[in-house]
Amino acid sequence: TGEEIELKKTKHIKESTTDPECGLFHKGEKQKCFAYSHMTICDRYGYVLFNKVAPGNMHDSAIFSEIYNELIQKYEAIKNVCLDAGFNTSPICHQILTSGRVPFLPYKRPMTKKGFFKKYEYVYDEYLDIYICPNEKDLHYKTTNREGYRVYESNPKDCEGCPFLSKCTHSKKHVKTITRHVWESDREEADYISVKPQTLPI
């Protein structure tokens, strides 16, 4: 007909026909089931302060972000927030610190492929806003993605003949990419708090 037709991308979402409010929960890599997730927040003595039921496909960190503001409005005297490693994300650390509370979270090891350099081996220069690789080459800021991560990339000319290339990237274009959340400094502060001597008993 010669008419222009606008095509829109669709997203396939699995939904329970008997209970549409639940979510698809992943039990490992292969097992899946429709379920709910339940989060309980207690004080230091084990008394329940707050609880939340959410669809099983919601990550614990997303559930926490929703209920945290309600929690501190109801219990203004809260000074410290102690969570497990699954909550050690930049947005949560930012949320706790900007509310005037102190986060206590165990250090979360970076998930890196075996044989590759760890992220901490790339030094971030806050003043120049660049990363410096183990071969002392610069990775410059490229863009910020929708998830709130700043993307840094190397110059392929620096990487082509680098003796550490196989431990750095498998990119066919010889480009190393590192991401840094816009609130990464808050997570770094939380990591610093976690290694203080007075924090260890907690």
Where are these regions (language model features)?
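Anion-binding and metal-coordination hotspots
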Residues: 1-202
